[in-house]
A protein has these predicted regions:
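Active-site core of PLP-dependent enzymes with the aminotransferase class I/II
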Residues: 1-18
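Active-site C-terminal subdomain of aminotransferase-like
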Residues: 18-24, 28, 33-100
Length: 100
């Protein structure tokens, strides 16, 4: 890894051109890039081709776990079909406090 990042605007332009969805993993951008340090993709959260933005907490946040930002439909899908969500425990109180 050498710190490269894609032209995220071009990625979304291509997705729009070809009718594709975009999922962005912000493992290394959160806290460092983008408006309010929320990563590069934050500005595209309402873009029609944005399927999900994934924020892993084990890298730049120094915590554990992750969260996903997406549509209500994606939320319902993950609640009902994501095995790693269904068969796990909730985050600890300390983890939630650290995340805030």
């Amino acid at each position: 890894m050498d710190g490269d990042s894609p032209d995220i605007e071009e990625v979304f332009n291509l997705a729009e051109k070809f009718g594709a969805g975009v999922m962005v993993d912000e493992a290394h951008g959160t806290g460092l890039t983008g408006e309010n340090n929320l990563g590069q993709a934050q500005q595209f959260i309402n873009h029609p081709n944005c399927v999900a933005i994934i924020y892993p907490l084990g890298k730049s946040a120094g915590l554990s776990g992750a969260f996903v930002v997406g549509s209500k439909m994606l939320k319902q899908y993950l609640i009902n079909f994501s095995r790693s969500f269904i068969y796990t425990t909730g985050p600890s109180k300390q983890l939630v406090i650290q995340l805030r």
